[in-house]
Structures are given as C-alpha cells and as structure tokens.
C-alpha cells in the first residue's frame, strides 16, 4: 500500500544556523553590559548621555562590519555573506535603542523639547533620517521580501550607504570638537564608500579571488 500522504516534512535546521544565533547573542552583549553599567551607576556623571552614546556607537560599528563583508571577500577570498543580514539587523536594533534612549530617557517624550532640540542641533535630524532609512531595510531583511521584490530589493538596500554616511556625519557633528574617535570612524566609512564606488572598475581589471567555502549556496 502506498505510503500515507499528507505527512509534513520536519524542517531541518540549515547548516551553520547555530552560528547565526551565536552572532546575535554575542551582538547583544554590549547592550546588556552597558545597561548593567548604567543600572549600577558606573556610567559617569551623565549616565543617560553615556548610555545613549554607547548604543549609537555600536550601531555605527555594526553598520561598518556589514559593509566590510564585501571588501573582505574581494581582498581575501573569505566570504561572510551569510552573516551580513544579521550584522545589518544588529545595527538597526542598536540604532533603534539609541533613538529610544534619546526620546524616552533623555527628552522624556517631551515633544516641544524634542522639536527645539532638533532645530538647535541639526545633527539630530541627520541621525533620525539615517534611522528612518534603516527601517525599510530591516523590514525587508528576509527571504520572502527578496522573492517578492526581486531586483528592486537590491536597489532598496543600497540605502544603507546613505544611512551609514549619515550616521558618520551625525557622530562628527555631535561633538563640540573633533577628537580622534569620530574622525577615525568617519574615515573608515569614507574608505568603505569609496571602495564601493571603485569596485566595478577594480573588478574589470583584476579577477576576483575565489571565495572560501564557495560550494556552499549563499542565496537562501
């Protein structure tokens, strides 16, 4: 007799799925640690500002790591494409926490104070625009959106370049003087964006290195 139909196949976890969950877990460690420092009074004289700053800094760091995936593959042959989505989402989560801290803890959801602050300090507007650009990218960072949007998905996700540029400018403008830290981050972002612009020309002149682990399908 034929085997009974209608039995559902059990979904088996994709190879390396545990590495993604490990990345997410490790990615949230800085947020948990910073919250712990704030809760125990170890964030200095202005804990809210320090908490807000550190969350924003980690958002920028994860954006940089997201953009580093492609040059690393081009220059070394090491491919980390399967982790790029997770890095991008971590950047968005930290940017959202940074924004929430500003709105709730810093400004106390006082709309008039927020508007006054935006007018007085334009870098806040730049930061909010950068976050707004990340929202559609986070919402479409899934396989269903890739299938539905087709080629438009790639075009949409190019907004990340504007978002990371805005984030670097936001950081630079948020300090009264230009200490080394924001300048270094801005220089890294500028280098990554220049690499992206020059990449099509570099690829025509030099064959790309064969990525390690190329046999593993990258498209999900």
Swiss-Prot record:
Topological category with respect to the lipid bilayer: Multi-pass membrane protein
Family of the protein in this entry: Belongs to the MsrQ family.
Pfam families the UniProt entry points to: Ferric_reduct
Major localization class: membrane
Signal peptide interval: none
Transmembrane segments annotated in the record for this chain: 20-40, 51-71, 86-106, 122-142, 153-173, 175-195
Function: Part of the MsrPQ system that repairs oxidized periplasmic proteins containing methionine sulfoxide residues (Met-O), using respiratory chain electrons. Thus protects these proteins from oxidative-stress damage caused by reactive species of oxygen and chlorine generated by the host defense mechanisms. MsrPQ is essential for the maintenance of envelope integrity under bleach stress, rescuing a wide series of structurally unrelated periplasmic proteins from methionine oxidation.
One GO cellular component term: plasma membrane
PANTHER family noted in UniProt: PROTEIN-METHIONINE-SULFOXIDE REDUCTASE HEME-BINDING SUBUNIT MSRQ
Name of the protein: Protein-methionine-sulfoxide reductase heme-binding subunit MsrQ
The keyword Membrane appears for this protein: yes
The organism of origin for this protein: Brucella melitensis biotype 2 (strain ATCC 23457)
Record flagged with keyword Transit peptide: no
A GO molecular function held by the record: FMN binding
Summary of subunit composition and partner proteins: Heterodimer of a catalytic subunit (MsrP) and a heme-binding subunit (MsrQ).
Keywords per UniProt: Cell inner membrane, Cell membrane, Electron transport, Flavoprotein, FMN, Heme, Iron, Membrane, Metal-binding, Transmembrane, Transmembrane helix, Transport
Cofactor note: Binds 1 FMN per subunit. Binds 1 heme b (iron(II)-protoporphyrin IX) group per subunit.
Cofactor: FMN; heme b
Cellular compartment(s): Cell inner membrane
GO terms, biological process: protein repair
